[in-house]
A protein has these predicted regions:
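A glycine-rich, often tryptophan-bearing local segment used as a flexible ligand/cofactor-contacting loop or short
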Residues: 124-189
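N-terminal Sec-pathway targeting helices
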Residues: 2-22, 31-36
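Structural recognition of the beta-strand scaffold that forms the well-ordered cores
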Residues: 69, 99, 116-119, 144-147, ...
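Ser/Thr/Pro/Gly-rich low-complexity linker/stalk segments immediately outside membranes or between
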Residues: 35-60
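Helical hinge/lid and interdomain linker segments adjacent to catalytic or ligand-binding clefts
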Residues: 76-153
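A glycine-centered loop/beta-turn motif at secondary-structure junctions
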Residues: 64-68, 143, 200-269
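Short hydrophobic beta-strand segments
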Residues: 60-78, 269-273
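The substrate-binding groove and active-site-proximal loops of carbohydrate-active enzymes
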Residues: 118-125, 241-244, 276-277
Length: 277
């Protein structure tokens, strides 16, 4: 041991060893810093739902209790077009429905089992005296929606005052742009242009008890969506006269006026996460 110490003392390049040691220490520190903190990931156990327990949309819809009566007329083209949109709306909103084609079927005698009635007819003549049955049901606390632009005739005249209408004619008004109330839709409070607009709205004037949520953005100001209380219930009327997919959201918002609570999913939405650029 003493001999080894003498050799170290006699070594002429002891300063170089110190410098070399410093470099080795710095290298070790840099290596540790570049390597990062090491960690051990815990094993994850993934649990998948059995395929036979997955509930498909069509199955879920069939299990819903029918709370909405939908009246259509297969002989009216716009009724068929509107039902295509409303069928999807009711699926998205998880609303159970009973569908009645008044061209072949009779509406139920008792409407008390339903919370809402949606009438997808512009010509109400196939309903005949059932128009009054629906209005009486609304007066007792029901909620009904006329989703198509109505054609003025004898049966419409029977209920137009109950719908909040004080004056009407046999003419239709042009709809080139729709202005929405700010409390009706997200993005409301301004007007939206309508591509290929035409005379699609029934020219009417409403009473003060009617609350208007959308109207034609022109000098006529024809009301396009409104609600009117009647007795213990209410009517909702869509008067814009467009039945394409692009207007599905307007129908859904109108339907939500019938009930205290409405749920509608955000569709066609995407989230993108960008990193390392």
């Amino acid at each position: 041991m003493a001999g080894w110490i003498k050799k170290v003392k006699a070594f002429q390049f002891k300063g170089i060893l110190v410098i070399l040691g410093c470099f080795l220490l710095i290298g070790a520190i840099l290596f540790a810093e570049r390597s990062g903190l090491s960690y051990r990931e815990k094993a994850k156990k993934l649990t998948y739902l059995d395929a036979d327990k997955v509930v498909m949309e069509e199955t879920a819809i069939k299990t819903l209790k029918p709370t909405c009566l939908v009246l259509t007329d297969s002989s009216q083209a716009n009724s068929t077009m509107a039902w295509i949109q409303f069928e999807q709306i009711f699926k998205d909103m998880k609303v159970g429905t009973d569908l009645v084609d008044v061209n072949h079927e009779s509406i139920p005698d008792d409407l008390s089992d339903y919370e809402t009635v949606v009438v997808l007819l512009s010509d109400l003549s196939p309903l005949k005296e059932n128009v009054l049955k629906i209005s009486d049901w609304v007066k007792e606390g029901g909620s009904a929606m006329f989703a198509l632009t109505l054609q003025k005739d004898t049966y419409v005249s029977l209920i137009e005052q109950k719908l909040g209408i004080v004056s009407s004619g046999y003419t239709d008004a042009m709809v080139n742009s729709i202005y929405f109330d700010s409390e009706f839709l997200v993005g409301g409070g301004k007007a939206y242009k309508v591509t290929d607009g035409y005379e699609s709205a029934w020219a009417v004037e409403l009473s003060q008890r009617a609350r208007v949520y959308a109207w034609a953005d022109d000098t006529s100001g024809v009301p396009l969506i409104w609600e009117a209380d009647y007795g213990n219930g209410k009517f909702v009327v869509d008067n814009f006269g467009f039945y394409e997919k692009a207007f599905r959201g307007f129908f859904a918002a109108s339907y939500s006026l019938l009930t205290d609570v409405g749920v509608y999913p955000v569709i066609n939405g995407s989230v993108f996460y960008l990193d390392d650029f």
